[in-house]
Amino acid sequence: MANNMNFVRVVANHNSQPSRHIYIKAPVTMAQTVRGADAAGNQNQNAGKGGVETTQLVGGQRPGAARKANRMLLGLLEDSARYDMKSDYSLPDTWLRKRRATAQKTAKAEDKSVDTKKTRAAGKKTKPSEAGPDAKARSGMTSAPSSSSTDAAAPAATGKARNGKARAASSVTRNTVLANASPFASPSEDVIELQHQFFRITDHQDCVNREITSSLLLTPKDVADQQIVRLHFILYPDVSEEYKVTFGHPNNGVFNPIHEIGKCIKYAVEIYFPKTFKKKGSKLLQQLSKAYASMNQSAFVEAVEQYNDLVRAIPQDQVNEHLQQTKKIPRAFIHDILQMAYSRCVLPNVNGLKEYRSFSNFVYGELLPTFLSTVYQQCDLKPGQIFIDLGSGVGNCVVQASLEYGCALSFGCEIMKNASALAKSQLKELEERCALWGVDLKPIEFSLRKSFIDNERVNELLPQCDVLLINNFIFDTKLNQAVEKLIQGLKPGCKIITLKNLRPSGYTINFDDVENILNRLKVEKFTLPEDSVSWTYRGGGEYFISTVQADIDESVFHSYAKGRVRGMRPAKYTK
């Protein structure tokens, strides 16, 4: 009891104010007080004799537990000084008590883990002997003793044979994986219906003079067994692009010429070939896939040459007539055209994008094509509408909205110098390639090296905007407030895509500012799928689609929209 009294006396003498004022008004003083209390507790423990004094409870707890609780409290106080719920719309994780998984969920997770282990163990087992001698004869296997001691006593001389079998097995596995991963082995499944004029055949002489970035700049130099192959365009057989092909080093981690050749031939057969030539094109694709699966470089090059001969033999008027009747195309065709321009203009200069300052408004990140197709579809983006991207980076979102949905205008604004330069070069490359593929690219406009704040062109277009994209994942408070002012003039029906909610947590209507657009937003939250953004492959994040309404949204009046519900039973949380 003496230790307890000494402890209380030290705290009281350190600061004459009540303890509740210490906690609220002076966290630094609180830290000093706790340190003083710890020191006093240590002195009292040293003064005691025997084991009885050292185990004396302090304030109903052991001294170690009290110090631990004080450190946790200090951590919370320091954390609270960094966050302001009103301005940053978030709380630190240490303020949120996480629910424990229920017993049912825990049991299911354990069962799933056991099943996974069993599956892995079963995958390592050989085929059972009940398959019969015929199966063993076909596979070239001989019966082996099942005794583990016999396996352990196998002579070391068989190591070479085993290694040889392992190498052969790994070679077969690699070929199987390549065959399964063939970009041109199976027909495209995700098909979209064209709601606008997608194809436009331009003057032949104009396309002959088109300048595209060569793929040779993306492939390594002086590689053994490397062959240069020409691939002719289906609409303009006089125009071709060169590729370096080698199965020894098919992929340098950035660009795979073999994949791109196969995809170009696949799309030409699926989309551009008239019905009378479809059968020949399908056989050619099978030949190409077989050469790819067997890693036969000469057979692959021969198949490409046969494709070039077939392209020259197809009458161009039949191709043009077939395109006029085409109403569906694979969505992957659009994504791959975008990738062709991106890989030649952005990837070689991607290091310039790393100059962005971390944890600032100028951190660079990309939304990937598959996610953009999904979110544009959720926003019901249509031909003839206006799409705007504020903070457009290298322009990926802008060009995809134009190419995939045929917007009347796709507009992007970017302030950073390097990203602006890449956006300009990527747009030029895309225009050249779309012309060679006969694709009608709708109007695209950029406001480069300029902020979207106090931007005359942005202010002019926003009232007409139908779909607005703002990647506000790392915007600070000041920029979020500027965005709130900027979007006040959006028309009813406009969709706003964001990675952070425009309306802060616990937002309720301010009757002194009833006309604020935040009162008229209908906010929908969605889970971010895997491979949606460039900065992480994991999913599980959130994105929001807010629809501007003509009237005030009812949710801003509801009690659950408040940050703290009063007069209601508090929610129960597990410890």
UniProtKB/Swiss-Prot annotation:
Domain of life from the UniProt record: Eukaryota
InterPro entries: Dot1 (IPR021162), DOT1_dom (IPR025789), H3-K79_meTrfase (IPR030445), SAM-dependent_MTases_sf (IPR029063)
Gene Ontology MF term list: histone binding; histone H3K79 methyltransferase activity; histone H3K79 trimethyltransferase activity
Reported regulation of activity: Ubiquitination of histone H2B to form H2BK123ub1 is required for efficient DOT1 methyltransferase activity on histone H3.
GO BP annotations listed: DNA damage checkpoint signaling; DNA repair; global genome nucleotide-excision repair; meiotic recombination checkpoint signaling; methylation; mitotic G1 DNA damage checkpoint signaling; mitotic intra-S DNA damage checkpoint signaling; negative regulation of heterochromatin formation
GO CC term, one of those recorded: chromosome, telomeric region
Coiled coil regions, renumbered to chain: none
Binding site for S-adenosyl-L-methionine: 364-367, 387-396, 414, 451-452
Chain positions covered by the region annotation Disordered: 40-65, 102-172
Keyword Thylakoid: no
Residue ranges of every copy of the DOT1 domain listed in the record: 243-561
Principal subcellular localization: nucleus
Xref: Pfam families: DOT1
Enzyme Commission identifier(s): 2.1.1.360
Biased composition (Low complexity): 142-158
Subcellular location: Nucleus
Compositionally biased tracts (Basic and acidic residues): 107-118
Reaction catalysed by this enzyme: L-lysyl(79)-[histone H3] + 3 S-adenosyl-L-methionine = N(6),N(6),N(6)-trimethyl-L-lysyl(79)-[histone H3] + 3 S-adenosyl-L-homocysteine + 3 H(+)
Broad class of enzyme this protein falls into: transferase
UniProt entry keywords in alphabetical sequence: Chromatin regulator, Methyltransferase, Nucleus, Repeat, S-adenosyl-L-methionine, Transcription, Transcription regulation, Transferase
Family affiliation: Belongs to the class I-like SAM-binding methyltransferase superfamily. DOT1 family.
Note: In contrast to other lysine histone methyltransferases, it does not contain a SET domain, suggesting the existence of another mechanism for methylation of lysine residues of histones.
Function: Histone methyltransferase that specifically trimethylates histone H3 to form H3K79me3. This methylation is required for telomere silencing and for the pachytene checkpoint during the meiotic cell cycle by allowing the recruitment of RAD9 to double strand breaks. Nucleosomes are preferred as substrate compared to free histone.
PANTHER family with a match to the protein in the record: HISTONE H3 METHYLTRANSFERASE, HISTONE-LYSINE N-METHYLTRANSFERASE, H3 LYSINE-79 SPECIFIC
Protein name in UniProt: Histone-lysine N-methyltransferase, H3 lysine-79 specific
